[in-house]
Amino acid sequence: MGLFICLGMIFSYVETLVVLVPAIPGIKIGLSNALVVLLLYSYGITYCILFQLCRILLSSLLFGNLFGCLFSLAGAGISLLIMYLLKKVKWIDVPGNSMFGGIFHNIAQLFVAYALVQNTTVFYYFPVLLFSGALTGYAIGWIGEFILKRRLL
């Protein structure tokens, strides 16, 4: 578990340095979510929850702020729940499951933003978040599946 948390911290730090689309703030690759995929499919939900809590709290203390922690906890919690439930659906593969996780991660964060600002204009951002969550979620899931099949970690 320590290795996963260390890798998650490194990935979180790298993501603070990389701006995926400069014109659109807040879109991230979600590198540490590849670790969530690996943990979910290899060790189960309990390890995922512990990993996410440790990574988010430590990352928020080191690289972020209270609001970032709220957004991350909401996104991680909802996406992990969705991925856990969809893992039981036989026709959804690892990249597809991760794609749904990415989408719901962004949806949860959108609702946190709405709760904070109390303005419906935040929902104009939904199409961008839907597309970016699907794209990055699928890519991260593909990486996770690649590692799982080859037992690289």
Report each predicted region and the residues it spans.
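Short helix-perturbing small/polar motifs within transmembrane alpha-helices
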Residues: M1-I5, I10, F51, S72-F104
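Short glycine-rich loop/turn motifs that provide flexible caps or phosphate-binding loops at active sites
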Residues: L7, I29-L31, Y43, Y47, ...
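Membrane-embedded alpha-helical hairpins and interfacial helices in multi-pass inner-membrane proteins
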Residues: P25, N65-L70, L85-L153
